[in-house]
Amino acid sequence: MVCPKVVILSEGADLDSLSAAYGVLKLYPDAYLLKPKHLSKKAGEVFKKYRDKFRVIEDLPDCFELVLVDTHFLPEGLPRERIKRIIVYDHHPIGDVKEFEGKIEKVGAATTLVVEEIKEKGIDINPRDATLLAFGIYEDTGNFTYEGTTPRDALALAFLLEKGANLREIREVVMETYTPEQIEAVGKIVQSIEKVFINGRQISFATAVLERYQPDINTLLYEIKDLKESDAFFVIIEAEGKTYVFGRSQSEDVDVGEILSHFGGGGHREAGAVKLENVSAERIKELIKAFLKRKYVKLKVRDIMNTPPFVLEEHVSVKDALTELSERGIANAPVINREGKLVGIISKKALLKLVKLYPDEPIELFVNRDFYTLSPDAPVWEAEEILTKFGQKLIPVVEDGTVVGVVTRLDILQAVKEDLEKLKEKRRKIKVPENIEEIAREVGQIAKEMGLRAYIVGGVVRDILLGKEVWDVDFVVEGNAIELAKELARRHGVNVHPFPEFGTAHLKIGKLKLEFATARRETYPRPGAYPKVEPASLKEDLIRRDFTINAMAISVNLEDYGTLIDYFGGLRDLKDKVIRVLHPVSFIEDPVRILRALRFAGRLNFKLSRSTEKLLKQAVNLGLLKEAPRGRLINEIKLALREDRFLEILELYRKYRVLEEIIEGFQWNEKVLQKLYALRKVVDWHALEFSEERIDYGWLYLLILISNLDYERGKHFLEEMSAPSWVRETYKFMKFKLGSLKEELKKAKENYEVYRLLKPLHTSVLLLLMLEEELKEKIKLYLEKLRKVKLPKEKIEELKKQGLKGKELGERIEELKREIMNKI
């Protein structure tokens, strides 16, 4: 039985609900609207006028799929047994429907979500459709002035205006109107807003790059809430080769007319403007920010504090509090009561002592209640005085009784360090390889248009600096990486594979494999566990990485394209050929990094830094490899197998005794070592002489490694490794047949006998046999000559003319081949 979709509106549904419902009818040809009992005044008027556009039913069918718009509260009195599925399009976070399909996302109007899907699916709409859909977005965003309005709402509306939405009719029903170009410009401005605090004042910056300048755009600026609520703001619009700057101020301290006069413009304290040529919006923004800092800056606590802060609640037990601090690598934390008010500070050092005696007691019994706090607008020198003169390790930053941040000595040192780095211009330019140059610049352009920042990151930066060819490129985006990837894919007409739960997307353009990821921070709930992930800055994204040489980035943003970003000395370590972890608990957070460190050291012929080596040994001795996810360890060994310098990696495995922790029953011995080095010579010879017959030689090294294990253990390990069938067959042959074959080969006097014994064998077995010194020449002879012996076609035809066929012919051919081989 086919169950139709039925849209049911909530009691008193508004214009956004009605517009979204109509959009659902466009999305689903089998959808109907249950005749609404009561609508808001505007929605009722529109429904009456557009009644012919809606497919309406008055009674619910025996079975149906329920569609909810602008809500995900289940209407009362519904026959739930008839509902087969629930679909939701809502922008409110609260609701009682738990299992559903569809979208609940933070936008200004539910209709926006439906319009996005209509656009994505390429569903055709006419001007009347577009008008009906536009009603909801205009109303629920309050003419784009409500706090919840997003760039997505503006872009959805721009799409509807392109489809012919009737502005006159919209104005009559809802509002004053703007052009599609103005709406698109507003979307870009809202998306790019950046807030900074200078001398305790919030100053906002926004930029937009437009095809054509919109003459009345400045009249819209006060309608943008985030700008309107700033003490001052600067909106910078780049269009048709010119850059327009508008400044507005509501603060006695910030005279925008005077500021813009330094750039050739003018005005008064409350408003100013300037028009410039041949200079980008981003460049002007940075120049204005630099000017403001020189003129006004007196560094405040809010400029350097960590926010949002990690806090503990006073009822948490000593044991749980210690776990929380340990997982996050935090030494001290503010403690709050159930009302969210600050009551004290607790340290990890104190908890380590208390956990032995009072593990289950609440921390409110032990917090330090004698401490200093600061407001966000306090000068930094006050923080420095508290930290140095009074010995307090952490300062809670409190505003209106709420902890809004924390400051440590490290924050002050870091602020000074960053200022010095800027003064010294330590960042250097890197030449982006030609094969990725075009895409990199395009990503930078798209990022600029979307108000994002994008960077090439990680191992690809390392390989670029080492002069290696790169075809797999990882980008990190400060902002929505998936949307950037989708736009790049759209421009190239390729598919994109988004993974919203991870904030990543993959796509392929020509030979290039591209991965985009939203900048994120990670915390590990326990050693080796998969991390908890949340959005962050580029710096926080880089600091979560494994080693300094993998924690560099190259900007692809137009204003600083090609700039190397190296917060942790990765370039220096690359030059010094050193593997160095970024922080002391790196191997504890993720023990798989032990194997990664050794893989990179072996591959690049680098050494571990002294501190990294010490930390690695400690992690191995603590048995952390046994706690790591088995699948990730196995995968890391498989990656090592593919390395050209796998033997060097194995030597490092041996040096730091890691395989003993991973493979049950494994032990190194001198015989295994000798075979490994003998195998290298054999492999090098085979790869050179028979390049067309190359196999994955890494598996041969692995077979030698596990040769001393009992068969079942070795077999199980190969199964874990998902070893190819030829590897497993070779291992079985090694354990049960190789010994007897060696003896037969040693006894073989004729070349033909050698040929007969070796012909059925896989190349892997032949190479393993060459490890026996007295068999090496026989195997070489077979590979180079014996297996190539064939009778000329003429000779075979002659035998056939003699009346030989079938088995007799085969036996005669073998006799002749035997004669030839034995003469070699």
UniProtKB/Swiss-Prot annotation:
One of its GO terms (molecular function) is tRNA binding. Pfam families: CBS, DHHA1, PolyA_pol. Its EC number is 2.7.7.-. Its cofactor is Mg(2+). Keywords: ATP-binding, CBS domain, Magnesium, Metal-binding, Nucleotide-binding, Nucleotidyltransferase, Repeat, RNA-binding, Transferase, tRNA processing, tRNA-binding. One of its GO terms (biological process) is tRNA processing. Mg(2+) binds at D472, D474. CDD domains: CBS_pair_SF, NT_ClassII-CCAase. It is an enzyme of class 2 (transferase). It catalyses: a tRNA with a 3' CC end + ATP = a tRNA with a 3' CCA end + diphosphate. ATP binds at residues 459-462, 545-546, 550, 590-599, 603, 632. Transmembrane segments: none annotated. InterPro entries: CBS_dom (IPR000644), CBS_dom_sf (IPR046342), DHH_sf (IPR038763), DHHA1_dom (IPR003156), NT_sf (IPR043519), PolA_pol_head_dom (IPR002646), tRNA_nt/polyA_polymerase (IPR052390). Residues 305-363, 367-423 form the CBS domain. Belongs to the tRNA nucleotidyltransferase/poly(A) polymerase family. tRNA nucleotidyltransferase involved in the synthesis of the tRNA CCA terminus. Adds the terminal adenosine residue to tRNA. Can incorporate CMP into tRNA ending with C74C75 (tRNACC), with very weak efficiency. Adopts a seahorse-like shape and consists of four domains: head, neck, body, and tail. This is A-adding tRNA nucleotidyltransferase.
